[in-house]
């Protein structure tokens, strides 16, 4: 049976990638269907109850700058907020929020149900309708056919999902949910490279059975940070603490004695796990010299006693899990509510995708999230927003969009994936970005909101707030530039006394703010400056203090822009370019980079090869011009 209405975009999956994809397409005005196997799990946090962190919060802020839901839901569901790396430079500062699972999911559901142009339908997708290498729709579990020319797949860990606890395993998409087997088989029939990855989760603990008095309390920051540029503190729920404890020699003995019962170390699990979020058995094996590892005890919500012991993800048998947990200080009498487990799932080589996240072999088919080999809610949400945006642009007959590496962490993420691929779950870090002083979390809106407005992703409320902020920054910079302080005046003496730096001559406030020892808040207090919005003050201070470094990065970006903007034809025959080695010809033909800049980032492609490519492109262009003039 065919569904009576046709859609422009269909999104399969209602996790972090799927919700952002569906919302993005709908915000852009196209008729969008969100297909989920269970409406009750829309926006569910399947793993740890937290959003943000180093590199990750940059993605969340970028999603927010483009009108996405993740930051707003975090502000409404966050029960502890902290700024990480607060004593370091602004490039690596990151916001992290502990979230109440129920409140977060409810916030996402509310946003979805109130989004115009978005329809939600509960059914598992079993098949894709493909005609002449173009996607045409989706077939559900009950045989219902939905038609659309753009389909976004955000399947998470559900494709061929296999859950492991000890040497026992069973099919599942996550604990309590069935896997997507029919769709996994269908996708394996397509000419796409497929692999297996693995992730895991720790046992959940009943907080009433834990002794917090022997643990270290970890409170949130005051005043509480906000994740969204439009966030308001009055929307944040009650704030509570996390706690820290440690594994010990006894814990490590228990694990070492039972590695033969681990599916990871007995060869049962084929998939590669996340390097930066290893299981506790992996930590003990890889870091055998360490006597202990931190365990962060994270509350799962305000209305539950369940705790998430971050740091002891495991797939060991339940009896071993119980021994591990009870060997840890403060958890000697702990009751496990849910056992930890590992899950294996299918992913597809992201080098088979375009920058738009559309597959190269099936027109209109987009992939986002863990299906592309990434790990993390934030990485999934960022890909989802981009895929949904490009699916909508395709439906509108417009050119696809993806930010460059120098414009957004989303650009870094996508470029890394489609250029380098990944053999293990990919996690974002600030260290992956060459231009991280420009790509700060605090200026994501200044980098992206204008483009989001142009694309149709940003609504009137967000645009008005953004314009007010941007204008406020200009006004404040002008005020500081035109306000002068002279030595020997009360203000000049106060500045000298406060910062221990006598004024040698007359300075404007912007010059003074550029000094590392002078901060904006103190300067505003001494000079009795008018009150300014915190976001405006932050931008003015960072731009002023880091102006020289920022200018140098901008100059470097300008120098490299030519190669980034030089497009490589999709039909370019690399084997016909003389001077390229067979190895480089193979790598270029296998990856089929979209630009000269991307080609240069493929491992093994040398600067000399890039020069040969550039010469070939110039000759090709000249030849085409001659043909046209003939």
From Swiss-Prot:
One term of GO molecular function: flavin adenine dinucleotide binding
Gene3D superfamilies referenced in this protein's UniProt entry, alphabetically: FAD/NAD(P)-binding domain (3.50.50.60), GidA associated domain, C-terminal subdomain (1.10.150.570), tRNA uridine 5-carboxymethylaminomethyl modification enzyme MnmG/GidA (1.10.10.1800)
Domain of life from the UniProt record: Bacteria
Residues annotated for NAD(+) binding in this entry: 273-287
GO CC list: cytosol
This protein's UniProt keywords: Cytoplasm, FAD, Flavoprotein, NAD, tRNA processing
One GO-annotated biological process of the protein: tRNA methylation
Cofactor(s) required for function per UniProt: FAD
Localization, UniProt: Cytoplasm
Annotated FAD binding sites: 13-18
SUPFAM superfamilies in alphabetical order: FAD/NAD(P)-binding domain
InterPro entries associated with the record: FAD/NAD-bd_sf (IPR036188), GIDA_C_N (IPR049312), MnmG (IPR004416), MnmG-rel (IPR002218), MnmG-rel_CS (IPR020595), MnmG_C (IPR026904), MnmG_C_subdom (IPR047001), MnmG_C_subdom_sf (IPR044920)
Function: NAD-binding protein involved in the addition of a carboxymethylaminomethyl (cmnm) group at the wobble position (U34) of certain tRNAs, forming tRNA-cmnm(5)s(2)U34.
Stated family: Belongs to the MnmG family.
Subunit architecture: Homodimer. Heterotetramer of two MnmE and two MnmG subunits.
Protein name: tRNA uridine 5-carboxymethylaminomethyl modification enzyme MnmG
Lineage of the species this protein comes from: Bacteria, Pseudomonadati, Pseudomonadota, Gammaproteobacteria, Pseudomonadales
Name of the coding gene: mnmG
